Amino acid sequence: MTEKKNRREKKNPREAKITFEGLVMEALPNGMFRVRLENDTIILGYISGKIRSSSIRILMGDRVKIEVSRYDSSKGRIIYRLPHKDSKRTEDSKDTEDLKDTKDSKG
């Protein structure tokens, strides 16, 4: 039993990608964004399919994780939106806790 000589090896497609964190500088049409990476380079980022299908909003000023190909470092795919430190959601939860405390003290 001879093996084929021209047989392709299975490669992990994620090996050719580098992940960075960046800041969204500008929103462009069709789910495209200008993103400034940690090393101060500005690249064009597009939304990944999972983010698009789950309707996650990405706005200017958001911090994101972006995958950049080694072969074309001018474009990247936004794979994750990082949570804000001073998010409105955390403020809302603090407000509801304060309301619960005031109700408990009154009743």
Swiss-Prot record:
For the region Disordered, give the residue spans. 81-107
Q: Which GO terms describe its molecular function?
A: ribosome binding; rRNA binding; translation initiation factor activity
Tell me which PROSITE patterns the record gives: S1_IF1_TYPE (PS50832)
**Gene3D superfamilies on file:** Nucleic acid-binding proteins
Q: Ligase: present as a keyword of the record?
A: no
GO cellular component annotations of the record: chloroplast; cytosol; plastid
| Pfam families according to UniProt | eIF-1a
Ranges of residues in domain S1-like: 8-83
Give the record's keywords alphabetically: Chloroplast, Initiation factor, Plastid, Protein biosynthesis, RNA-binding, rRNA-binding
From the Swiss-Prot or TrEMBL record, state where the protein is found: Plastid, Chloroplast
Basic and acidic residues composition-biased segments: 83-107
Q: Where are the transmembrane segments?
A: none
**Record CDD domains:** S1_IF1
HAMAP family named in the record = IF_1
- Relate the protein's function as given in its record: One of the essential components for the initiation of protein synthesis. Stabilizes the binding of IF-2 and IF-3 on the 30S subunit to which N-formylmethionyl-tRNA(fMet) subsequently binds. Helps modulate mRNA selection, yielding the 30S pre-initiation complex (PIC). Upon addition of the 50S ribosomal subunit IF-1, IF-2 and IF-3 are released leaving the mature 70S translation initiation complex.
Family (UniProt): Belongs to the IF-1 family.
What does the record note on quaternary structure? Component of the 30S ribosomal translation pre-initiation complex which assembles on the 30S ribosome in the order IF-2 and IF-3, IF-1 and N-formylmethionyl-tRNA(fMet); mRNA recruitment can occur at any time during PIC assembly.
What is the protein's name according to its record? Answer: Translation initiation factor IF-1, chloroplastic
Q: Which gene encodes it?
A: infA
